[in-house]
């Protein structure tokens, strides 16, 4: 996820505009909280908030889709190519964040299923 951003910085391109930082900050906080919640559930094996976490991740992905479409519209309306590299880096960040959420959701579902199947097998052995 960070490779295009690192390349962008290493090549001395312009930094992201403050407006993009401001737009992305609540997304970053929300994704960090989702990752923390997912980690807690997987590491403790306690899945009481499982459905809420998946629903929140879906909502975040939907919001990212809107932001991405809005950004694509901004790119199409902009005149000139001065900011194209910065715009592409930001677009990539939005897309990779969506992908991260998809992988996180998949990992949470798989971990829960693995635990439940293991408990089911232990129960059948005990019977």
Spans of model-derived segments:
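Cytosolic, long alpha-helical scaffolding segments
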Residues: 1-127
């Amino acid at each position: 996820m960070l490779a295009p951003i690192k390349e962008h910085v290493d090549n001395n391109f312009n930094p992201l505009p403050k407006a993009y930082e401001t737009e992305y900050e609540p997304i970053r906080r929300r994704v960090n909280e989702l990752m923390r919640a997912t980690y807690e559930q997987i590491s403790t094996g306690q899945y009481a908030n499982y459905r809420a976490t998946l629903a929140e991740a879906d909502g975040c992905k939907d919001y990212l889709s809107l932001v991405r479409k809005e950004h694509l519209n901004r790119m199409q309306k902009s005149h000139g190519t001065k900011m194209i590299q910065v715009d592409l880096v930001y677009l990539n960040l939005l897309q990779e964040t969506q992908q991260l959420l998809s992988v996180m959701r998949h990992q949470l579902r798989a971990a829960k299923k693995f635990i439940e199947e293991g408990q089911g097998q232990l129960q059948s052995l005990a019977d």
